[in-house]
């Protein structure tokens, strides 16, 4: 038995929960540390980079799920660890004005938990999707699950932004507690009972060690080339993650709630960008994965250039440009995810989890690297330049990286041909 559309939707709810919790740490808490607490942007940048760096263990989670099974347990366990880490991170933000050293130690511990939680839950979930979804449904399954994740991010950011104003430590802790507890409960209900009904491959007599499994996947030319592309493009994608909200607060005067809402609107743009590609490919038969990846990269570059220009125009409206950035980010992301899901099922069988783990690690390392470099560069240049110029230089570098990623995509995705998202037929 393979996954049906209802089961795919249920697993997508887990992605929704992951996005809802993670956005608290990369958006709300990041903004509070930089603007309200006046801490250097490199501090939350380093913490977020730590949680991404720990996800280098994703290949190990993937290989374990390939050889041992019981992915459901690790999906739920990972979500519980992620939720605990996010709540402790919020507690640390509240403690910073009172006990800086203790708050920093608690923050480090919290983001370690976040990193392990996302790695365990996310990799096990994606491996379950890739291995139990029919090939003709994989790209559509990717679209559904990532749309739900972005929906969770956008709704959480918008809702939290609404209830966070006026800001108070007590209000922050209540909001984070509700979101994290709700995520654990919904994840458990969503994933429970799905895996036991699926067809299970016969386990290997001598399961490979991690390095052996990685060597097998790395020997596949397509998997290797896609890993390099994913690292470069995700570095571009995440370079602004930790500085866009501080930029809105410092240059445009946005409040804490307004910047959190801005993040929600950006992710709303991502949602509609993903939806556009899904409808264009599956319904209207317009374009290919390669074409949409390139479109997303180039459109993101143009939106970033607009954000740079607006910083030097008094009274300029930032929101439309940020929504545009989200829209083209969504176009890029869903096309790249479709290619990734398709490639996960190619090559040697019973290595879907290892491939997803390898690409998840590449994405996580790129996200941590991009976020930390972006925050550090902005901090450094703000010492010598006006805020608008300092942030603008980072956004400009991100725009250039997206152009390079578009050029690379023409080779990497073209090597697979013009793969299309399968049509979702009513009643399936």
From Swiss-Prot:
Gene3D superfamilies: MFS general substrate transporter like domains. Pathway: Porphyrin-containing compound metabolism; bacteriochlorophyll biosynthesis (light-independent). One of its GO terms (biological process) is photosynthesis. One of its GO terms (cellular component) is membrane. It comes from the Bacteria. The chain crosses the membrane at residues 3-23, 32-52, 73-93, 115-135, 144-164, 172-192, 225-245, 269-289, 291-311, 317-337, 358-378, 393-413. This is Bacteriochlorophyll synthase 44.5 kDa chain. It is found in: Membrane. The lineage of its organism: Bacteria, Pseudomonadati, Pseudomonadota, Alphaproteobacteria, Rhodobacterales. Belongs to the PucC family. InterPro entries: MFS_dom (IPR020846), MFS_trans_sf (IPR036259), PucC (IPR026036), PucC-rel (IPR004896). It comes from Rhodobacter capsulatus (strain ATCC BAA-309 / NBRC 16581 / SB1003). SUPFAM superfamilies: MFS general substrate transporter. One of its GO terms (molecular function) is transmembrane transporter activity. PROSITE patterns: MFS. It holds the Pfam family PUCC. PANTHER family: 44.5 KD BACTERIOCHLOROPHYLL SYNTHASE SUBUNIT. Keywords: Bacteriochlorophyll biosynthesis, Chlorophyll biosynthesis, Membrane, Photosynthesis, Transmembrane, Transmembrane helix. CDD domains: MFS_BCD_PucC-like. It is a multi-pass membrane protein.
């Amino acid at each position: 038995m393979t996954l049906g559309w209802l089961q795919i939707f249920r697993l997508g709810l887990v992605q929704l929960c992951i996005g809802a919790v993670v956005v608290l740490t990369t958006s709300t808490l990041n903004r509070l540390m930089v603007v309200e607490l006046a801490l250097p942007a490199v501090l939350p940048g380093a913490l977020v980079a730590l949680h991404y760096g720990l996800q280098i263990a994703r290949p190990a989670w993937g290989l374990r799920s390939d050889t041992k099974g019981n992915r459901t347990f690790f999906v739920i366990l990972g979500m519980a660890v992620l939720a605990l880490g996010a709540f402790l991170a919020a507690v640390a933000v509240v403690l910073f004005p009172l006990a800086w050293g203790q708050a920093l130690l608690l923050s480090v511990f919290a983001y370690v938990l976040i990193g392990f939680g996302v790695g365990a839950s996310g990799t096990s979930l994606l491996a379950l999707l890739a291995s139990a979804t029919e090939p003709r449904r994989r790209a559509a399954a990717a679209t559904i699950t990532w749309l739900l994740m972005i929906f969770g991010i956008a709704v959480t950011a918008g809702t939290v932004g609404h209830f966070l104003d006026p800001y108070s430590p007590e209000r922050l802790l209540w909001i984070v507690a509700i979101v994290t507890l709700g995520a654990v409960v919904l994840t458990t209900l969503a994933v429970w009972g799905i895996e036991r009904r699926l067809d299970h491959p016969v386990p290997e007599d001598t399961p490979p060690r991690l390095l052996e499994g990685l060597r097998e996947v790395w020997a596949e030319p397509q998997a290797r080339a896609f890993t390099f592309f994913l690292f470069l493009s995700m570095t571009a994608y995440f370079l602004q993650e930790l500085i866009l909200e501080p930029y809105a607060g410092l240059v445009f005067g946005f409040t804490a709630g307004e910047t959190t809402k801005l993040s929600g609107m950006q992710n709303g743009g991502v949602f509609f960008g993903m939806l556009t590609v899904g409808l264009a490919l599956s319904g209207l038969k317009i374009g290919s994965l390669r074409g949409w990846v390139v479109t997303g990269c180039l459109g993101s570059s143009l939106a970033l250039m607009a954000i740079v220009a607006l910083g030097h125009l008094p009274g300029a409206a930032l929101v439309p440009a940020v929504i545009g950035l989200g829209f083209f980010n969504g176009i890029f992301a869903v096309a790249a995810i479709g290619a990734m899901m398709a490639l996960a099922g190619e090559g040697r069988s019973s290595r879907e989890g290892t491939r997803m783990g390898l690409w998840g690690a590449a994405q996580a390392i790129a996200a941590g690297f991009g976020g930390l470099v972006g925050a550090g560069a902005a901090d450094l240049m703000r010492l010598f330049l006006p805020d608008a110029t300092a942030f603008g230089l980072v956004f400009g570098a991100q725009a250039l990286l997206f152009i390079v990623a578009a050029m690379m995509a023409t080779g990497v995705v073209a090597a697979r041909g013009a793969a299309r998202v399968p049509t979702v037929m009513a009643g399936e």
